[in-house]
């Protein structure tokens, strides 16, 4: 077997994808025969050091979680030459799933169940003191058994972090991300709301960082919040969307973090309430009136 088919003590089974400076493979540990997902980043130039640091941060953060919705992070391997790190390999749980952008839910109840699981995973992250900061359809994997996995902790950070660079995804990015203000759990609430909107309406919401191209990856420049028109409510775009779910999404994507729901726990509770309504349509639907009144 040629060296190109191995990375350290791991044999490459398949290429799963790639990022800006990373490649992701399905691999097998040659010693234990266990199968993993491996993210590999090579430092070819000095400017690549930040991509190495990003993977190291992804390991440091991911290793602190233990939740079924968050992809498990196993270990980080540094490949050195002359005492200098030339590349890193992040060994992660191999998830057999399809991203949400490629396999949309076939029912509103199915969509709400996906949203609820994502919110549960984010609630766990917040409880450990971290924010994901890049929730979007491509970072959500759907498994055959109905489970969900949140992936890609490359933008994750401690609650309250003020980043030096604008990071996030146009079309999903909260105003505080585009304006380099403190990242908090309410940032994830906005990102989740923007993702829910896209899933149900198939359009990105108007954000302070709108996409320049159709792939939602190119920044067009940050706008002021006063220049942004509120999105049309989902149920007005798609009449199949329940008004309670539409209200939930609109609450999440408020431009001012103070106007969003108080916590991800509130989101979880509301989504459970909405699921109850969808499963029991003959019963009167409760009104969501505030952060504390979520189970009335």
Label each region the model flagged:
Residues 45-64:
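AlphaC helix of the eukaryotic protein kinase fold
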Residues 72-88:
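Short beta-strand micro-motifs within the conserved protein kinase catalytic domain, predominantly
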Residues 83-99:
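Conserved short submotifs of the Hanks-type protein kinase catalytic core
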Residues 114-115:
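Activation segment signature within eukaryotic-like protein kinase domains
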Residues 120-130:
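Protein kinase catalytic-loop region centered on the HRD/HxD motif
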Residues 164-176:
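Conserved activation segment of eukaryotic-like protein kinases, specifically the C-terminal portion
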Residues 188:
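Conserved catalytic-loop aspartate of Hanks-type protein kinases
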